[in-house]
Amino acid sequence: MRALMNVWEPHEVSAELLAMQNIELQQQVVEKGIVAIEGEGGQLWKGDITRLKVDAIVNAANAQGLGCWAPLHNCIDNCIHSAAGIQLRKECNDQLQGRLLKTGEAIMTKGYNLPAKHVIHTVGPIIDTNIPTKEQEGQLAQCYRSCLNLAEQAGLESIAFCCISTGVFHFPNERAAEIAIETVRNYPRQSVKTIIFNVFLDKDYDIYHRFLSEGSPAAATDC
């Protein structure tokens, strides 16, 4: 089913088909297990972001904003769309109407079959060399601000960030973590109380853990 979802064109489908899909995806939620993060401030969690029960998870999207079209690809964009259901691509398409997302921009959708209430989709910079430019560093910081702007406008209280741009977009992991933590720390939050830095790789966990617990110049223990 997932492979078919990944190549599905965003158009209306029958209620019966949606119901069948939703039953299957909700069963997958039960099998994977739902993770609820307690407490406020900045927190680090390693695991599958599609398990998190928060107000919003952040998706590292591409400029088209419609998810990954490669069947069964393991990028976070594909994983989130596959777990949410075909409704997610439809809503993204309805919002964008063929327009491309700018680097640093974000849009927010419902979470559908995810434990998260919403998905915030943002496009990070693509790095062609090992060293990002100052402009690209600024674009990555803008991704985090754009996501927080949408969360604040909607009155959300919790948000989980993936490691934006560090996957197939090749942003250096350590510098990306510094920018993420610094941007979140300096953002004037009001409604958002809990920010989760979600990582999937051991090396990202080690980087974030070090910055958050050992006093990196760009980090705060409590974001």
Give the ranges of each region predicted by the language model:
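Macrodomain-like recognition of ADP-ribose-binding/processing modules
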Residues: 1-223
